[in-house]
Amino acid sequence: GEEIAGAKQSEFDKLRGTKMGLVPQDPMSNLNPVWRIGTQVKEALKANNMDVAHEKRSALAKALAGDEVEVKGNDDETFLGAKELPELMTEAKKALTEAGVSGEAFDKAVARFTNEWVPGSETRWRVADDLIKAGVADDQAWYLAKKYVTGSTMDDRIAGLLSEAGLPDAATRARQFPHEFSGGMRQRALIAIGLACRPDLLIADEPTSALDVTVQKRILDHLHMLTDSLGTAVLFITHDLGLAAERAQHIVVMYKGQVVESGPSLEVLQHPQHPYTKRLVAAAPSLASQRIISAKERGEDADALLDHHIAGESTLEKSEHIITVDHLTKEFKLPRKKEMFKAVDDVSFSVKRGTTLAIVGESGSGKSTVANMVLHLLKPTSGKVFYEGRDTSTFKSKDLLGFRRHVQPVFQNPYGSLDPMYSIFRSIEEPLRIHKIGDKKWRANRVKELLDMVEMPASVMGRYPNELSGGQRQRIAIARAMALDPDVIVCDEAVSALDVLVQDQVLRLLNDLQAEKGLSYLFITHDLAVVRQIADEVVVMQHGKLVEHATTDEVFDHPQKQYTRDLLDAIPGGKLQLGLD
């Protein structure tokens, strides 16, 4: 019940960590790339006086209190954290002397401090690193460091927090850097940091929006178990209404900085009152199965939709394959490993002209590796990719330039794929310049046409990517991909980072362009709910292998493999009947 809106910075500092924890959205932006994971967990503990050094101060205070001696000054400043025993002992004696402690009480306090002190976790890491530099294998070096170097209670606490957040082999993981973790593991590390100081409230800001559905489900299940056992309240910020419906008891809907609707979760989502809430529910891809059913009820069967996709291509048969992947395999050499890692293992499929084929699977299933080989950005270890019946591995530089003109990518992060130093005009015009298409005046008019095609005003031509929203940047990326009038667009997680309304707009734009231009899409995604909105066929991948390939309706209504069923079961809100009328 305490009012904190007008609180001072110092008052907020006391609330952060111990009263309120945070799990942010993007772990790569919120984890320091040059700090070990364990160091970052320790930082959270130290910032809130819950580290080993603070325990030393507490032990000293208790020793003094036993003799009814009052410590003067700020106890938090008595000792500094990661210092070795001699320096800490000097500061301890100085602090005791300044506090007026002497004689037997002084000796007792110093003895207690000395007996309790053990080297910090940094000592183990330093020894392990020296062993590795001397040629000892990483696992063996860490084993020796743990066995022969006295550890601290901080080591155990950090490992305990990481293990509690669901990370296996937590002691080893604590020594690793963020780039050595998968997306799901990094998110678990952030959960460990957020809950390290046992806050009363945990603010989870889009904690799983970039993760695939099965990893998302495991992490959220684990987070629910943790917060429930700790008695921690959760403020869950999300654009995914399926997640909100499944995970929250109460929902607050915000629009342009104001609360427009609130109430019990199912009541709000089954009976939305505000127009904005109704738009959110209608656009939510987690609930898209109901929208597909209602489309069928209107008589739009799959064949009619497919005919619509290839309007204007009457000379071509529907079964004609524009992209064929034949027994594709890709292996990578891993550091310090003799065996090769097989990222893609004997995958075959074809993309029919004018249709959309989606490749789905968990992170690490090989989806993006397949996409990169189709785009000729990676060379297959074995197998072939055919474009209109031609083996792309036989292409010379001139052929490859022509191939690039006909097969274009749209990547997940438009801010990463658009040069931040290029204006929007230059970004869209660049492929036209590279392929020597038209003069300067013609290219300027073409850029305007492309912007109009993706429903962006011509006024954005002089702006830069950082001046646009995520959805606007993705529209620019699509306009750039459309500049050369391609036959195929490879969309690699093209809508996964967008909120539901923008995602819905981009998906509708892709559908409209497909109907108008007869485009073929290879759509890479971890979100099966999106797949149902846009795909004609689905390929399911697991551990680099193709485990299922069928039409979208067959995969969703009659999945053959248990892995596919697990993916479908993990779709947030997929089984909830919400108000879409």
Language-model region placement:
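Conserved ABC ATPase signature
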Residues: 177-181, 185, 464-468, 472
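ABC ATPase "signature
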Residues: 259-263, 271, 549-550
